[in-house]
């Protein structure tokens, strides 16, 4: 009687070691294990590389890494992974009890359930309509960027034609012409560019036929009496301050973006890209190396004194070379630390009357860049990567510095037409690209679990 019992026990042990008995090769549980959790596969999902994982393991991996690649071989997958139905049915038939227990454990884990939901939502966004949506999305994305490239090509051709046809007129600007050679019409043009208020004195300068040489001889006393009769002391002060700058330079100083670009093509391109990619370092550069000509007018424009904020126009603020007060420094440093792009937007806002569309492009781009910066900070905080901030800051500083040094070294070799294309690309096309980046960040944020 004891021997049959021993035979029964040995047979049960063999059944436990080999749950599936057949006339062919025997199958063990380890052959159907996930390479992430090393347990029986639940809803096995097979990637393009051929590796299979539990769907919730793949979702957890995607949530933590934000990468669409295989956890084992790191090969990127295409499309959105789906459950391997044939493999799932086979495992459920071979190990029904183990699968049932694992499914119950998964359903009771809120983190896993939320990760699966976010992962599935990400897949729905990738394929919202039909199985062929992936190809449609690729065509749609390709169509968008091909449209941008087509527009850029068209603009480049227009700029090429304009560059060759307007070369003489560009050199004919007052910023390139000696003041003693100005005509009466050019003197009036210089006067009108001081501000809307200067149109009050336009006819007086025309009637007196004031040319460049005569302009250089005028004094404050002559401006205050007939025939000029400029009674407003603020207007006289602005005209005299600007006249002193003209006398010192010998030409008209730049008073808008296009004149500044004509006089300083390299610096304008450098500042545009520096303030776009790294506004804090760009403003620090202005403070250290261009304090009087650029930084002082900038801080007086964006952080004006209370008594001057309503009475002065933009040109008067540009001529204000007084040292900033502590109140101005405090306002500037707060915005500089937390919202640097707002400083650029506020500066562009004051130029709306002079540059109607260009200022609006700059304001929109500054808003978009602020949103992208907030997304970057949120990503660092949500991933608990605050310790990497110093290293990121150093890498960013090194990248911007090397790019600036590279540009300074090779600037004489770069054709002016290429520089113009880069300038207009950053000015007008960069906001379109940033809109697309913000939309992608918002969609990515919707798939994250809070």
UniProtKB/Swiss-Prot annotation:
Domain SAM intervals: 182-249
One MF term in the entry's GO annotations: protein-macromolecule adaptor activity
Topology within the bilayer: Multi-pass membrane protein
Region of interest (Disordered), residue spans: 1-24
Glycan-carrying positions: 232
Extracellular side: 162-331, 382-404
Stretches assigned to coiled coil: none
Keyword Transferase: yes
Reactions mediated catalytically: S-ubiquitinyl-[E2 ubiquitin-conjugating enzyme]-L-cysteine + [acceptor protein]-L-lysine = [E2 ubiquitin-conjugating enzyme]-L-cysteine + N(6)-ubiquitinyl-[acceptor protein]-L-lysine
Residues annotated as transmembrane: 141-161, 332-352, 361-381, 405-425
Zinc finger (RING-type) in chain: 34-74
Stated name of the protein: Bifunctional apoptosis regulator
Gene coding for it: Bfar
